[in-house]
A protein has these predicted regions:
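C-terminal outer-membrane beta-barrel translocator/porin domains of Gram-negative envelope proteins
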Residues: 410, 423-425, 435-447, 474, ...
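C-terminal segment of classical bacterial N-terminal signal peptides
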Residues: 20-29
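A generic beta-sheet turn/junction motif
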Residues: 197, 371, 417-419, 624-628, ...
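Acidic/histidine-enriched alpha-helical segments
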Residues: 265-267, 338-355, 551-552, 593-596, ...
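Gram-negative/organellar outer-membrane beta-barrel architecture
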Residues: 393, 398, 410-576, 651-657, ...
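Patatin-like phospholipase
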Residues: 2, 11, 29-85, 95-400, ...
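Gly/Ala-rich beta-loop-alpha elbow adjacent to hydrolase catalytic centers
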Residues: 86, 90
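Solvent-exposed coil/turn segments that connect beta secondary-structure elements
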Residues: 102, 111, 194-197, 207-209, ...
Length: 753
């Protein structure tokens, strides 16, 4: 609902809706799910002489935010609401109101919520573990496809897992509320979802209220379905768009129905396939609504806010407009609504009580763990201890950190009462496309003058391989620098404080030599294979120190240049120390935080190396945002401190942040140093991915001898660029220039700090 579905998602949606329609046409289906218990809907004001009044709030995505002003009008007129049933967005608004939230609170929540962030499951980079942060350097992204041991190929059921959406529902309804019957809420409530296996409506009348809301809003192909009591549930709008039958089954004698569904379009022969698919899905949802509305009697009322095409299903950023339209509809319906007034006029101004349940003291913690992670590992993310009060805010933050494992479809908790005691039940479910997750990536550098590097990457992540979260990854790279590598990462404790990593494989790199005018005159190809191993001490998700060793063998040959230069074989063996301080929000468009890397590499003959030398590497970056503006500062210092580094160990420079007036990897040397300052302006942000324009000033150089390094020998570089953090990687178009040379145009994909 947060975004306009893609063509593939529309096809999935229409297929699901069609399947549902084949089995859900009969009206009594929803009523059959909930017993016609007229005691659910009782006169809350004690006035048994009047009829019981129920609300049926229809689905419609962002259009459903107009429900709030309808509710506010009922309060103003003093119309009692005895029970509520809601579908999709109607379940969102209805559940908040039924749980005791005032209309002012609900309105404030929908106006202040960052809906783009809510519908973006990605955990902010600064909150991820160091392991997940390090994956940014692999330039790989999960594509929603994987391999399962029981079913072969697995495909993610939706684009979004709805983690932040569920957290919003928990905050909105009171996370500390003990699960139970929805009849026990301040206003009895029902949420309507759809059984994915039958297409029939499922009326949820007990359990976790936030999970009921989440199930009712599980739009097919957009959100992952929800598992509840043996059923897999989708959005309720698929089967019961306006739950009039449900609120009637609760015992309502007079019904106020609110229809916020999207009307059918008027198409002609030029209609696109996307428009046709929209129309097909519209047939099903509007048909469901029409069948429900036909059951209304002369004492009932339907209100249709005139949303037209001004507020679409995914237009959550238009909350203020939806509220305004809802107010107009409520005002227009006022004469008809007056027939629902039974209380004295003075009662109309009495505010509704807003019971806020206190965070309960926890007596027990249960976990239903469907993953291969250890129970204790998952619980270590959640600050819940028997004998202490539940901290709902900390629980929500811990759940979001647990999603940082990258392999969970859901991790939820429910406050339950057992044997007179209150406790927490945690349920963890793995992604359906695991435990072998397919990944893909693309890196590109092109100066539009014939110098380009392109690498296509495909990987498989196997996770978890141990209760503590061991992982393995195999990566195949094709293109300018082909390779086949593998890694095994093994934590030794729950907190991932101590871990080991073993990497190995084959890699090929090119080293280019350019003349003074920037034309390539030579290119060397370096092929190497070998293995490295490290032990890490992780102090937090920000700081890590590692020690290790590496052993490689390979060869260097000329691809462009003097054919008389013979191929040379080499042997590499070194011990290494690395330290990382990583608290930056992005490696590609940094706006806040710091990043520092330090490394020592000692090549030794007793490790099998041809040459003995030592290298010191240090990089530091910082970024700070001011609204849409951000500034960046950085410096790098890399030297061969002793000995002579061979060709395979020299440094490469060129490109944005690395002397942008040079082509990618144009500069080579055994030593280099640079400083830079940058500025970016965020043009837009969509589902956590931003489009930015900016520029850099850079000063530095590369040298063959350390004695030649001199501040006055640096070269001033500058660049301006525009970029977008796309789903295939950060794509950047820019112009780089340096003193004493012509400007170059560059295109980069997947290049970062």
């Amino acid at each position: 609902m947060a975004t306009k579905p893609t063509l593939r998602q529309r096809l999935c949606l229409v297929a699901g809706l069609c399947a549902a329609a084949c089995v859900s046409v009969p009206l009594p289906a929803a009523a059959q799910q909930a017993s016609a218990d007229t005691t659910s809907c009782i006169q809350r004001d004690g006035n048994l002489a009047r009829p019981r009044i129920g609300l049926a709030l229809g689905g419609g995505g962002a259009r459903g935010m107009s429900h709030v002003r309808i509710l506010k009008k009922l309060e103003t007129l003093g119309i009692p609401v005895d029970c509520i049933a809601g579908t999709s967005a109607g379940a969102l608004i209805g559940a908040m109101y039924a749980s005791g939230r005032s209309t002012d609170e609900i309105e404030q929540l929908i106006l202040t919520t960052d809906w783009k962030d809510v519908f973006n499951d990605a955990l902010p980079r600064r909150d991820r573990s160091l392991r997940r942060k390090a994956e940014d350097t692999t330039r790989l992204t999960q594509v929603g496809i994987g391999f399962r041991s029981d079913k072969g190929v697995g495909i993610a059921a939706g684009v979004s897992e709805g983690a932040k959406l569920l957290a919003l529902f928990e905050r909105a309804t009171g996370s500390g509320r003990v699960s139970g019957r929805f009849d026990d809420l301040p206003i009895p409530f029902r949420a309507v979802a759809t059984d994915i296996n039958t297409g029939k409506p499922v009326v949820i009348d007990h359990g976790s209220l936030p999970m009921a809301m989440r199930a009712s809003m599980s739009l097919p192909a957009i959100f992952q379905p929800v598992a509840m009591e043996g059923k897999i549930l989708l959005d309720g709008g698929v089967s019961d768009q306006i739950p009039i039958d449900v609120v009637r089954a609760m015992g309502a004698q007079r019904i106020i129905a609110v229809d916020v569904g999207t009307p059918l379009s008027v198409l002609d022969r030029s209609a696109s396939i996307v428009e046709v698919l929209d129309q097909l899905s519209g047939f099903l949802t509007t048909g469901s609504a029409a069948r429900q509305l036909e059951t209304l009697g002369p004492d009932d009322l339907v209100i249709r806010p005139d949303l037209d095409d001004r507020v679409a299903t995914g237009d959550f950023q238009k909350a203020a407009l939806a509220l305004e339209i809802g107010q107009a509809a409520a005002d227009a319906a006022t004469p008809a609504l007056r027939s629902f007034v039974y209380a004295p006029p003075a009662h109309a101004t009495t505010p509704r009580p807003v019971p806020v349940p206190p965070d309960p003291e926890i007596a027990f913690v249960h976990i239903v763990n469907h993953t291969d992670y250890a129970d204790d590992l998952l619980l270590s993310y959640l600050p819940v201890t028997p004998g202490q009060r539940l901290d709902t805010g900390a629980m929500q933050a811990g759940i979001m950190r647990a999603y940082g494992l990258g392999t969970l479809a859901s991790i939820t908790y429910e406050v339950k009462r057992e044997n007179g005691q209150v406790g927490v039940e945690v349920v963890a479910t793995p992604k359906p496309n695991g435990p072998a997750y397919l990944e893909a990536g693309l890196t590109l550098s092109n100066d539009l003058q014939g110098n380009r590097e392109t690498n296509l990457r495909a990987g498989v992540l196997f996770a978890p391989l141990s209760p503590y979260g061991a992982e393995a990854r195999v990566v195949l790279q094709l293109g300018s620098e082909p390779g086949l590598t593998g890694e095994y990462y093994h934590p030794f404790d729950l907190a991932n404080r101590y871990a080991a990593s073993v990497q190995g494989g084959y890699q090929s790199r090119s080293f280019n030599v350019f003349d003074a005018q920037g034309y390539q005159v030579e290119r060397y190809r370096l092929d190497r294979y070998g293995v490295s191993a490290f032990l890490f001490r992780n102090f937090s998700n920000v700081l890590s120190i590692g020690v290790g060793a590496e052993r490689y063998a390979g060869s260097a040959r000329v691809e462009i240049g003097d054919p008389a230069v013979r191929r040379e074989d080499f042997q590499d063996g070194a011990v290494r120390v690395v330290a990382t301080l990583d608290d930056i929000d992005s490696l590609f468009f940094p706006r806040d935080g710091v990043l520092a890397r330090f490394g020592l590499r000692g090549s030794r003959d007793w490790m099998g190396a041809d040459a003995e030398f030592d290298q010191i590497d240090f990089d530091a970056y910082a970024a700070k945002s001011f609204g849409r503006h951000a500034v960046q500062l950085g410096s790098s210092y890399h030297v061969t401190a002793s000995g002579e580094a061979p060709l395979q160990s020299i440094y490469r420079l060129g490109g944005r942040w690395r002397l942008a007036g040079f082509q990618h990897n144009q500069l080579t040397g055994k030593h280099y140093a640079l400083v830079f300052a940058g500025y970016t302006y965020e043009l837009a942000n969509f589902r956590g991915r931003s489009a930015q324009v900016g520029g850099t000033l850079e000063y530095g150089n590369a040298w063959q001898r350390r004695s030649d390094m001199d501040l006055d020998d640096g070269i001033l570089n500058a660049s301006v660029f525009i970029g977008f953090d796309s789903w295939i990687g950060p794509l950047i178009f820019g112009i780089g220039d340096r003193k004493g040379s012509d400007p170059i145009i560059f295109v980069e994909l997947g290049q970062g700090l």
